[in-house]
Swiss-Prot record:
Pathway(s) this gene product operates in, as recorded in its UniProt entry: Cell wall biogenesis; peptidoglycan biosynthesis
Cellular compartment(s): Cytoplasm
EC number: 2.5.1.7
Sequence positions that bind UDP-N-acetyl-alpha-D-glucosamine: R96, R125, P126, I127, D128, L129, D309, V331
Keyword Cell wall biogenesis/degradation: yes
Keyword Cell membrane appears in the UniProt entry: no
Keywords: Cell cycle, Cell division, Cell shape, Cell wall biogenesis/degradation, Cytoplasm, Peptidoglycan synthesis, Pyruvate, Transferase
Active site: C120
Name by which UniProt lists this protein: UDP-N-acetylglucosamine 1-carboxyvinyltransferase 1
Amino acid sequence: MDKIVVQGGDNRLVGSVTIEGAKNAVLPLLAATILASEGKTVLQNVPILSDVFIMNQVVGGLNAKVDFDEEAHLVKVDATGDITEEAPYKYVSKMRASIVVLGPILARVGHAKVSMPGGCTIGSRPIDLHLKGLEAMGVKISQTAGYIEAKAERLHGAHIYMDFPSVGATQNLMMAATLADGVTVIENAAREPEIVDLAILLNEMGAKVKGAGTETITITGVEKLHGTTHNVVQDRIEAGTFMVAAAMTGGDVLIRDAVWEHNRPLIAKLLEMGVEVIEEDEGIRVRSQLENLKAVHVKTLPHPGFPTDMQAQFTALMTVAKGESTMVETVFENRFQHLEEMRRMGLHSEIIRDTARIVGGQPLQGAEVLSTDLRASAALILTGLVAQGETVVGKLVHLDRGYYGFHEKLAQLGAKIQRIEASDEDE
């Protein structure tokens, strides 16, 4: 099993880093390519991540032709043939986000059989909102032997109110509605930038989607969609991770192509902590002086609130700010597992239900730790940068799902970090 080894204590990050296309955007975009019954769809600025390879397999398994040019960061999908109805367990079980193929398959074929999803084990992440919305559009759903089977002679528009602004459910319903009869209105819809990016692609394919980025999205169904060329939006979570890395090491880093508007909640909290954040033509610059960092209170919320996908990394930043900080996690259950690993490094923290209290400014020591999920893996590596001595982070399968060349980018900024492959250790 690969490991990342960090020599901590003196890792002030300086320089510039370029951000990849967004993982959370490209996966539903790949699912959307199934909707194009005419022409090829080309996605540009595609990140090279294990989740992308899995989604390519899912789409390819539906009888679409998928060509991934890694050097060009480009995926071409030809879904003009007969799309099959079943997304098999061997692919879908590896990644939770693959459930978003359910809506597109239904829209194209009228019958879908999709394995229950896998991925990060972060609390209870039910898919009932996906299913309730599809039922409102005339879909009959049954769950048997680990599969969701959905049938509809013809999807019809519906007025759907979501109890929670689920990103995945919003994406699934948007895609299903593009080829439905009539108008679909989704209220309390997710408002993330990745939702907007999906709407842009769908409209480029000939769909009629309005209101993406607001709490009410309206989709007027059309007869068919066609291929197009689309550039994947930049990854705001990767950008945020490097903002935090610069802040917690007292660094000076330009995050190229980062979008201020997409990172506004994070930037607000960085400024509150005493971090200098500057919008420049090429991206966002982050500077900090460790002695100026102040403890803060943060609560995760659906967008435009503070993103849950930045919670773990921000708790790492809290470890170097003197005083007691608090982090309240309202989006997912069981998302403080990384703090248990940080305690092995000397972190003083307490978890009471959905709230973590973190005592910052205390010396941390390097240790051997294990990643528990995607964002936790990044948080543990960042903590290793500021801990004294050597930190070894294992279970990198999580890291590779969402960060491309993470250790290399940190090393280019001055971090003492290397990745040791399993074969290297065996020699």
